[in-house]
C-alpha cells in the first residue's frame, strides 16, 4: 500500500468523519417460543445476553486496533409478533421490557425487532403487538419497533396503514414529555428487508442464520470532499468519483465485519451501503447534493442528483464487498442532517419533495416532525403514499414521522445525539379521512407476477 493511500485513509477518518455507523448482531429467537410467556421471556433474555455478551467489547477492541470509529453496537431479533404469538399472553409490553433489559445488560444502544409483518394480513400475534407498540415504546429506552404494511408481491394492507396512523399518534402522546421520542423509534415499511443493520427498522428475518453480524458504513463527508475536487466536471466524472470513494468506504466496512465475525465466532452477513448522515457539520447527505451544483437541497434537480449519488454508491460498494444487503441507499433523515434542517428552515425543502426523493433512496419520510394536531388519518395517508412508491417500484420505502404534541409549524423539536433536531414541517390541510376509512387491501401491481 502506498503512503498517500494510508494518509488518505487517516484524513477520511479524522477530517471527513468516516466511520462505521453500526455493527449489528442479528439473533434468531425462533427457539425461544413457548406457550408460557414468562418462560419465553426468560429464554429470550438468556439467548440475547449469551450471544451478544462480547459484542460491545469486540467493537471497542476493533476500534482501537484499527483506529476506525465504530459509533453504535446494536442487536436485531426475530419479529416479536412471531415469537410472542405462540404464548397465551394478551399484551406484549413485557416482551419489550425483556428486550430492553437484555440490551442494557450487554451495553448496546438499541435493540430492534419489536416488529410485525402484516403486508397481507394479521395473525393473533401481529394484532396484539401492534396494539401494544405505544406502551412498549413509552416504557422502554432502547427498544425499536417496525411494521411492514405492504410489499410488491402482496400489495398494501390498508387496514394496517390506518392502524399505524393511530399508533404513531398515540405513541407521540405517550412520549410527549420527550417531544414524541417514541415515534423516532418506530418505522412503517413497505418491502422491509430481513438483514437491515440500521435502526429503527432492523429486525432479524426468519430466513436468516441463528446469529449473524451485519455492518452499516457511513461517509457523507468523504463523498462531499471527493466531489469538491471535480467541480464543474460533467456528471460522468462525478459518478466515477463517487464510485471510487464508495469502494474505499465499503472496503472498511467489509474489514470490520470480517474481523468482528471472527472474534465473536458468528457468521458475517452483509455490509449495508447506505450513506447515513449525522447532525454534525461535514456529515451531511444534503451537502453532497449541493456540492453537485444545487444552491440548496430541495430545489429542482435534487431528485436527479440523489439518483446519481445513490446509484454510484451502490456500484462502487458492490465491487468492494462479497455480500451487500440491508437498505443500501442514501438516507435523508431531516433531523439528522444539518443540510436538510437548513433547507426546511429556508423553505426550500418540503414534504412533497421528500416524497419524490423516496423514489430514489431507502427511507423517504424519515425523522420528520409535523404539527402536534396532525390527524391519525393524515399520518396514515402519508404512510400509504410512501408504501405505494415502494410497492409500485419494487423497492423498500418507509416512514418515520413525529407528530410532536403541542408543536406548530416552525417550532424546533430537540431529540439530541444522533437523532438531532427537527423543524416542524407543514402538512396539507385537506382531509384524507374518507380515503383511509375504506380499509381493505390495495392489490399487488401487475408487474409483481414474475413466476
From Swiss-Prot:
Please name the Pfam families in this protein's record. DUF711
Query: By its UniProt entry, which InterPro entries does this protein fall under?
Result: UPF0210
UniProt-listed SUPFAM superfamilies: PFL-like glycyl radical enzymes
This protein's source sits in the domain of life called: Bacteria
Quote the HAMAP family the UniProt record gives.
Answer: UPF0210
Subunit architecture: Homodimer.
Protein family according to the UniProt entry: Belongs to the UPF0210 family.
Q: What is this protein called?
A: UPF0210 protein lwe0494
